[in-house]
Amino acid sequence: MNFQQLKIIREAARQDYNLTEVANMLFTSQSGVSRHIRELEDELGIEIFVRRGKRLLGMTEPGKALLVIAERILNEASNVRRLADLFTNDTSGVLTIATTHTQARYSLPEVIKAFRELFPEVRLELIQGTPQEIATLLQNGEADIGIASERLSNDPQLVAFPWFRWHHSLLVPHDHPLTQISPLTLESIAKWPLITYRQGITGRSRIDDAFARKGLLADIVLSAQDSDVIKTYVALGLGIGLVAEQSSGEQEEENLIRLDTRHLFDANTVWLGLKRGQLQRNYVWRFLELCNAGLSVEDIKRQVMESSEEEIDYQI
């Protein structure tokens, strides 16, 4: 048994048992992946995967138990590799933050400025992606902190802390008829072409749910990943825009006006996520503390390092 075999078991579960994708993620060949699986099954005397011909469909009960143990072993191995750095490089290094465009552009600048004053020798890397991509980066150890409004709070491999709550607001031209309606209604908004975020990011599900509850179908003519793109097309007259309220900026003041829609759409929460059980340098804990003053470094450490491992029934 070796680490590569355990990595293959873990990656197979992550890639929905597609061995081609497993091989790509681990920079090896598909034949090599298959060989490692066969050798591990022969060594343990069990079948790890449910098969149909050569295709993997899922995990057997022993395979599921093995996956829990493999996750634990690989996580602890990662912690061992981090250990020396934790004690020798406490105030310098690289902090990698995976986040959405909206948070990187509008929510993080002041926090990053304060962080740099505390840790001037720490370099920062911002990776922008979708909530799903952010969660994957955290799970794979490719990011230290993940920040998003969706997904991070319900992933068992991650620990998530609330940062702040926000609502959507409506962007329209200054002379738009909706500026004369108070309070705004979903029915009045649904009459106009709408530009907003694409599925799966920046509270899009809250928008869809609000219209669905009223039995309305919004005319979404364009969906985008970031607020600045939405603003651009609203300014061009393609439609009205639903954007995060924190995405305000000077560039919109000349042509656009924001209308309050807090009474129409449910609030969203921005979450700060870390990989559960993973050791971190002190500056990682401090960054989270800067974001959420209600959490102490000790509280954050305790929750991240607490075990939530599945109980394994060894009487399979």
From Swiss-Prot:
The protein's matches in SUPFAM superfamilies, at most eight in alphabetical order, are given as: Periplasmic binding protein-like II (SSF53850), Winged helix' DNA-binding domain (SSF46785)
The keyword Cell membrane is assigned to this record: no
Which terms are listed as keywords in the entry?
A: DNA-binding, Transcription, Transcription regulation
**Which GO terms are recorded in the biological process aspect for this UniProt protein?**
cysteine biosynthetic process; positive regulation of sulfur utilization; regulation of DNA-templated transcription
Q: Which residues bind DNA?
A: 19-38
GO terms (molecular function) for this protein are: DNA-binding transcription factor activity; transcription cis-regulatory region binding
Where do the HTH lysR-type domain residues begin and end?
Answer: 1-59
Purpose of the protein: May be an accessory regulatory protein within the cys regulon.
The record's similarity note reads: Belongs to the LysR transcriptional regulatory family.
Q: What is this protein called?
A: HTH-type transcriptional regulator cbl
Organism annotation = Escherichia coli (strain K12)
Q: What is the phylogenetic placement of the source species in the record?
A: Bacteria, Pseudomonadati, Pseudomonadota, Gammaproteobacteria, Enterobacterales
The gene behind this protein is cbl
